[in-house]
């Protein structure tokens, strides 16, 4: 997810891991694994003193260790509630804001970058949020091993790395195998919400999501920004400069 000031965190605006060029061959084994953790190197980002303190203080409660097994999410959250998965929450400002405004929903954020995890934990502590849990691991493996079929009420993927060069488009997160896997984890009627500020990526998202037979678009093409998704300072700056932002909201078909 895009965060308010990426430069302060030592991270670029689009906060995905960077594939290791030498590991591209691993992608050919299973197309779903185009974001496998062994094919990635994380961008170097400085963990601030406040983030480190939050990692130490709140990590034991709110960070769920990755394990290749299905956890008891009701026990982890301490209740049974609608569950939303967010892939790549960046520095977590929007995640915290959404969770604060939707206290009856639970949010599971997946992020590989430690500064972002620390930043969100800091917000959790400052705001007294209890409906967020974090996994610091590759999202594909989390999806495969820790999320049961038809168990999610929603998925958020906000401002993933656009990989704007044409030769890098195959590295984009929104690809047919991943979308099919995400759709399999959604309950009937649950939603998948993507957002991007790159028109070419928005067009690809629309094509890929529209081709998934178990999903249906909630709009003719792009959706109005739902009220629950906040506009970040970084996004607002882009809008002032005339940059577009595209939201796509699809739902899992009931049949």
From Swiss-Prot:
Enzymatic class: transferase
Residues the entry annotates as binding S-adenosyl-L-methionine: 86, 111, 138, 161
Pfam families on file: Methyltransf_4
Binding positions (substrate): 165, 197, 232-235
EC numbers for this chain: 2.1.1.33
Protein family (similarity comment): Belongs to the class I-like SAM-binding methyltransferase superfamily. TrmB family.
Taxonomic lineage: Bacteria, Pseudomonadati, Pseudomonadota, Betaproteobacteria, Burkholderiales
Biased composition (Acidic residues): 18-27
Location of the active site: 161
Entry keyword set: Methyltransferase, S-adenosyl-L-methionine, Transferase, tRNA processing
Name of protein: tRNA (guanine-N(7)-)-methyltransferase
Transcription regulation found in the keyword field: no
Presence of keyword tRNA processing: yes
PANTHER family: 3-DEOXY-D-MANNO-OCTULOSONIC-ACID TRANSFERASE/TRNA GUANINE-N 7 - -METHYLTRANSFERASE, PENTACOTRIPEPTIDE-REPEAT REGION OF PRORP DOMAIN-CONTAINING PROTEIN
Segments of this protein annotated with the region Disordered: 1-31
Main function: Catalyzes the formation of N(7)-methylguanine at position 46 (m7G46) in tRNA.
Stored InterPro entries: SAM-dependent_MTases_sf, tRNA_(Gua-N-7)_MeTrfase_Trmb, tRNA_methyltr_TrmB_bact
Pathway noted in the entry: tRNA modification; N(7)-methylguanine-tRNA biosynthesis
């Amino acid at each position: 997810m895009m965060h308010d000031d990426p430069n302060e965190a030592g991270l670029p605006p689009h906060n995905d891991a960077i594939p290791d060029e030498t590991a591209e061959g691993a992608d050919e084994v299973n197309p779903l694994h185009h974001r496998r953790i062994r094919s990635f190197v994380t961008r170097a980002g400085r963990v601030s003193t406040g983030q480190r303190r939050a990692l130490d203080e709140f990590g034991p409660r709110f960070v769920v260790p990755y394990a290749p097994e299905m956890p008891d999410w009701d026990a982890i959250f301490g209740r049974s509630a609608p569950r939303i998965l967010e892939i790549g929450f960046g520095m977590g400002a929007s995640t915290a804001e959404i969770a604060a405004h939707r206290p009856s929903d639970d949010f599971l954020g997946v992020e590989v970058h430690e500064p972002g995890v620390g930043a969100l934990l800091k917000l959790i502590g400052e705001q007294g949020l209890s409906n967020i849990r974090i996994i610091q691991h590759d999202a594909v493996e989390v999806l495969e091993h820790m999320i049961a079929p038809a168990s999610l009420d929603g998925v958020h993927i906000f401002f993933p790395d656009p990989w704007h060069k044409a030769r890098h488009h195959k590295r984009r997160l929104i690809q047919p195998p991943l979308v099919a896997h995400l759709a399999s984890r959604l309950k009937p009627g649950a939603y998948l919400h993507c957002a991007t500020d790159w028109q070419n990526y928005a067009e690809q998202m629309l094509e890929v999501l529209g081709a998934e037979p178990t999903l249906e678009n909630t709009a003719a093409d792009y959706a109005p920004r739902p009220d629950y998704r906040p506009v970040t300072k970084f996004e607002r700056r882009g809008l002032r400069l005339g940059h577009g932002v595209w939201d796509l909201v699809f739902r899992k078909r009931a049949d």
